[in-house]
């Protein structure tokens, strides 16, 4: 009897291992799960080549593939995540913090509301004040140089923080009042020094008290239809700084859709089933008014993911002629076609000097990090006459299509990027003009 049981267990073990192997390699059992959103990383099946074997990349790709595709790994992980969320209202994604009534928040935003996020960055209230005050001083210095020497406007806005707009759904947590909220200090110093800034968090909090529609979806932390109010105010504010003549947005109404609103953050929880969503989707009916007296500006946005609503919901091509998005001062997206670069792959000063407005923004809790290094880098570059000369020459060359065609051909011949070739030619022209 014992031998018979052992044989059965042995056969079942072999069959189970074969099932895992087949599922890993061929995946015959397709499990329908909620699609992941935001920024998932693919782990493609590796292809064995002599070059990839020789340089070790095949081994690395194989390990990544097996790590992500081993048998029923995804189903197992999602099942555990669903168990934690359904029974205990907990998530296995440390960035998210479940609130009451199926509301979801970013954990740093919740900590910021309770005064605890700043403790990760500063040792005391005085330390935080010194940091913020220095950041504001640098922004004012950069603004003065850009405005006086180049006619470029620099401004900021603090994007609305869901935790401060709808605190009634937050989880309970102890307040820490030793250091304070950096975004509030930034707002205060901007006002005291006269730096142009819009604090959208306090504005949206006031709007939420009277609005019959939710300004944020319960399971999403980004603005949707409400972004129309934010960007309308932003562009009106920009135009008021210098009378540029920016076309005017007109919000003709808010329409309710017959389906639930987007809840992109839900997909990052990696659950098996959708979370209950009774909140309808809303869309803003937006038109842009323009005549012969209006001009469409060039704009550089330096900030976070609150720009996505501008790219998907606002008729931006009717408002502006060109824009760049410096996403977390890491990735760069140029133009309406969103040509992608790393921040270190471009001449940042020439981008700054090639626009009419520079808009630095971020949601409230992220002001703990100031401008993520933007203002320090920009000040250092703009105070260097040689860097300014090269940047201006690059922009001058780029404005001439026939020269840019030559740049593209030379870049292809030399095996460098167009940006690198453009900078090399700008330096060559400057050196020859000085001879």
Predicted regions located by residue number:
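Extracellular glycan-modifying ectodomains
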Residues: 1-435
